[in-house]
Each structure stands twice: as C-alpha cells, then as structure tokens.
Amino acid sequence: MRAMVLNEPGKLVATDAAVPVRKSHEAMINVTHGGICGTDLKIYEGGIPTPYPLIMGHEMIGKVVEGSSTDDLHEGSRVIVDPVLSCGKCFFCHSGLSNLCPDGTLLGRDQNGGFGEFVAAPLTNIYPLPESVSDREAPLIQVLTTCLHAHRRANIVPGEAVVVMGLGVSGLLHLQLAKQYGADPVICVTRSEWKRELARKLGADATFESGADALLGTQERTEGRGADLVIECVGQLPVLAEAFELVRF
C-alpha cells in the first residue's frame, strides 16, 4: 500500500509500505480521509518521541474491508477510528478513563496510524458514521470530542459569560459548543482579524483583539464582573496570564 512514512524528524515521504496484519479482535479499515493536527506537527518536527519509521495520522475515517460482521459494523461500513488504544483491564479502563491507561498508546504516534491506505484497529475503537456527517467533516470528530469533554467538565449554565481565547480549530469548536450549551455572551479573543470575522459568522456575540481591547470589551459585556469561564486554546504562558485577567473571581 502507499503511505506517508516519517523516517526521522522532518523526513516525511510518500512510499510503499506493508499492509498491516489484522489481529482477531481488529477490523481492517480502508482509510479514505484524515486530518492533520498540532500533535502531528510536533511528531513531524521530533518534539514527541516516536518510533521510526512511522506511518503518521490519528484523525481518520474509512470503510471496513475485513474483520467485522455485526449489524452496525460490517464490510463496507463507513466508520471513524478512535486512535487511543488501551489495555481494557486496568483501574482506569474499568472506570471509564481509558485515556489514562498506563499502557495506552496512540495510533500515528506509538504505532502506525492512518496516513496510509489501510489501518488495523480494535473493534472497540471503531464507530459507524451517520450519512449526515460528510467525509470532509468527519475527521474533525476526534478533536471535537476533546472539546466536548472540556465542556462537560466545565458544566456551563445557560446565561453564563464565556470567553474563548485562541481561534484555531479547537477554539472555533469551543465557540460553537458554548453557544449550544446556552452561554451568553460568548466572547472570542484573538490577534487575527480574519479569525475574529469567522468567529462572528459562527455565532460569537463579540470579538476582540487580545490585550487591552479584550479586557475592556469583556468588562463592558459582563457589566464589570468578568467572564464566568475562560477557555484558553493557545497554550502559551502570556495568554494564560491574560485569561486570569478576564475571568471573574
């Protein structure tokens, strides 16, 4: 099969690779679409330890070609793959916290992933996709679930003021989720003018450039209280410090 193989940091090549060998508890997936995220860039640059050579990619969808014959999952089923693999036996796995499994691995980081024609994945890690979700949209489900997890932890109450800082993919998804949860207002903060414009199209009640404009604007939109919740999506210390200025105490 053809695959994108990382041989060393910065050396990603399209080349022939062996088709993965499917185990009895796995399905073989013909990968049709994938996504590239910040983790992939760090792996490519060598910022995350990984074995070489490696077929990258952990955001992927495709069709089952072998290994499943249930009503929901069978040959030809269009599916999304959960790339987080766990042992299924430890305390964390039994507690619904498989992402904390000490023996957990990630497809596309610790073992070959989805930037090839085929990938083998455990049957417990593949889910049927509804036809209402397009092939172009579906790879975003993986990052959407991480955002959704954060919102469930935050427990937004309708009418609370929420600020989203940073408008990459995660930030724009957080904006839309906050609106769905009933936050009002939802304020978006970024240095990028075109991202502020996009945020307004996606439902932001107000957008501001980071810095003094964001602080003044947030105070004005919350009657001087500050935001009930700030979602920081940049991951840099100066932005985190600014988040503490925007949130109420």
Regions found by a protein language model. Give the residues of each.
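Short Gly/Pro-enriched turn/cap motifs at secondary-structure boundaries
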Residues: 7, 18-19, 51-57, 107-111
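Cytochrome P450 core scaffold surrounding the K-helix E-X-X-R motif
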Residues: 39-43
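Glycine- and other small-residue-rich loops at beta-strand/loop junctions that grip anionic moieties
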Residues: 53, 82, 118, 139, ...
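Mid-domain Rossmann-like dinucleotide-binding core that forms the NAD(H)/NADP(H) cofactor-binding site
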Residues: 133-212, 216
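Glycine-rich cofactor phosphate-binding loops and adjacent beta1-alpha1 units
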Residues: 154, 197-249
